[in-house]
Amino acid sequence: ANQWLPVDQYIGGVEHAVLHLLYARFFTRALKTCGYLDVAEPFDGLFTQGMVGHETYKNTEGAWLSPDQVTINDGGAAVHNDDGTTVTVGRSEKMSKSKKNTVDPANIIDTYGADAARLFMLSDSPPERDMEWTDSGIEGAWRYLNRLWRMVDETPTDAGPLSPLNEMDEAAADIVKATHKAIAQVTEALEGFRYNAAVAYIREFSNAVGELDAGLKGAGPARRFAVETLARLANPLMPHITEEMWAALGGDGLLADQLWPSHDPALLVEDTVTLAVQVNGKMRGTIDVAADADK
């Protein structure tokens, strides 16, 4: 036990804080007091994740209904699938078998894939907060995965090496800089368990890459570098599609076996800064000026 303790990170729901976590800490301290252990605390870090919730449904007799028994009609009303009777929609609560507000993950995976489910759950809210499961959310995640795959189809596999930034079109050079910025942002977010922020940075980055004009000087290598990096950054969150992206781009071996990308701090320095414009103490707008501009 002295070799393996303390555990680096404990992850558990709020119910663990008054059961397993309490017992684990108590027995560890007791064993330390008795001289059997060298550590008093069994865990270095604690992270408590939120719960997944869903709307609750009742039929006309007050019995609970599961989500797959309910349909929203054209008028926006919830009705029973079997007889079309009105269904009462209750507030979103933690998924439980007693209230039948659970969603079968097998059906979701069969329809949208595991990556879409992972992406939706990670992007919907900070992991320490509760989240509500919605069909629109999982569909949005699925559409984004399809967009990522289309980006691979539009990326040249024989683009050649990156040129120096001063030999590229400005827009292509900006994508290279955006790639290094995304590496820094996503890395920091993942290390801090801010998975929703990591997804937001990945989406922002992919939007920028998608807008790059393929005809610009240096755009081909810049896009390939960006899309390869995008796959690497998204791999912990969406492992299945990013492995396919990596293979389609000609990557060697499994993406999961590759080293995590590192950023160049020099490329994170902004060429311009945004200044607020005030008139008589009231903000009237903003202007972008060169970072080295004279006062």
Q: Where are the predicted features?
A:
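Hydrophobic/anchoring residues in structured secondary elements
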Residues: T48, D288-V289
